[in-house]
Amino acid sequence: MRLWLVRHGETEANVAGLYSGHAPTPLTEKGIGQAKTLHTLLRHAPFDRVLCSELERARHTARLVLEGRDVPQHILPELNEMYFGDWEMRHHRDLTHEDAESYAAWCTDWQNAVPTNGEGFQAFTRRVERFISRLDAFSDCQNLLIVSHQGVLSLLIARLLTMPAASLWHFRVEQGCWSAIDICEGFATLKVLNSRAVWRPE
């Protein structure tokens, strides 16, 4: 099985430097262009199904990538970005004085501290691991397109490679690119990371 990984295109929150987990934030014109470019790069990729975050920025990206193709789609909450609670659509400069104690605790110990009324890294990790455990349900598929978010995709790569969850930072998943992980007999191999090349059958 191959997992094709695509991060949503650039959003208005990305440009503004805001924390955007579950809060709606539309794709910018650049983000739309990134998704359309991926449509061209992956035109010949033989997707059996697409698994997508519930969030509109990911769903919009998926629609653009797959425009003109009839690929069955599954919307999965496990693929949603980490939820930042009261910090959603806020800038870190504001949080340093508006929620100073909690934000300082999170910056010091991001693996265990929890954003105010949000989702901690441990809960986020368990959610992504639930998604991994569900991959067996798609064992009839050879090629799954996964459209999600940087946090989810970086963590997904780390855990599939049996690395600690905190290793996600080693795998920055860029916008406008595609990545691929091959899974054979339960063993995952990272084959492509952040490619801007046209995929062609080998």
Curated annotation (Swiss-Prot):
Pathway stated in the Swiss-Prot or TrEMBL entry: Nucleoside biosynthesis; alpha-ribazole biosynthesis; alpha-ribazole from 5,6-dimethylbenzimidazole: step 2/2
PROSITE patterns: PG_MUTASE
Any single Gene Ontology cellular-component annotation: cytoplasm
Residue positions of the active site: H8, E81
InterPro entries, per the entry: His_Pase_superF_clade-1, His_PPase_superfam, PG/BPGM_mutase_AS, Phosphoglycerate_Mutase, Ribazole_CobC
Pfam family, one: His_Phos_1
Signal peptide residues on this chain, from the entry's feature table: none
Catalysed reactions, as listed in the record: adenosylcob(III)alamin 5'-phosphate + H2O = adenosylcob(III)alamin + phosphate; alpha-ribazole 5'-phosphate + H2O = alpha-ribazole + phosphate
UniProt key word Oxidoreductase: no
EC number: 3.1.3.73
BP term (GO), one: cobalamin biosynthetic process
GO terms for MF: alpha-ribazole phosphatase activity; phosphatase activity
Enzyme class: hydrolase
Keyword Hydrolase: yes
Keywords: Cobalamin biosynthesis, Hydrolase
Family affiliation: Belongs to the phosphoglycerate mutase family.
Its job: Catalyzes the conversion of adenosylcobalamin 5'-phosphate to adenosylcobalamin (vitamin B12); involved in the assembly of the nucleotide loop of cobalamin. Also catalyzes the hydrolysis of the phospho group from alpha-ribazole 5'-phosphate to form alpha-ribazole.
Subunit structure: Monomer.
Record-linked NCBIfam families: PRK15004.1, ribazole_cobC
Protein name: Adenosylcobalamin/alpha-ribazole phosphatase
Primary gene name: cobC
